Amino acid sequence: ASLAFTQMEAPGSPVIYGGFTSNVDMKTGAPAFGTPEMAKTTLIGGQLARRYGLPYRASNVNACNTVDTQAGYESMMALWPTIMSHCNFVKHAAGWLEGGLCASFEKVIVDVELLQMMSAFMDELSFSED
């Protein structure tokens, strides 16, 4: 709807398509990120963006309270579909903790490492004789 409103107000304005998806932990009511459901909706969002001919935005989010193994797992579950959906812009790319309530320098380092691995994964393979 915001894309339509933007075009009504300023026709031809550049826009980027994206959504915020989170399922909820039924015990606590807290948002749960880095889940299979979030990964699937990220992929679906990328497909819709391509269908509409728009650039796509996704996020590297998690709900962990500290920088630990779970934080890494949740970030990978957010980053893989972000990369696989051919995302043009990664929002909340590094440092996000506790569902966005805080950021961490340590998590920034972990996330930058993960982003570098994703970038290297996307490099073309060389089959030259060198």
Where are these regions (language model features)?
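Catalytic-core signal marking the mid-to-C-terminal active-site face
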Residues: 106-130
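Glycine-rich anion/phosphate-binding loop at the beta-strand->alpha-helix junction
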Residues: 1-111
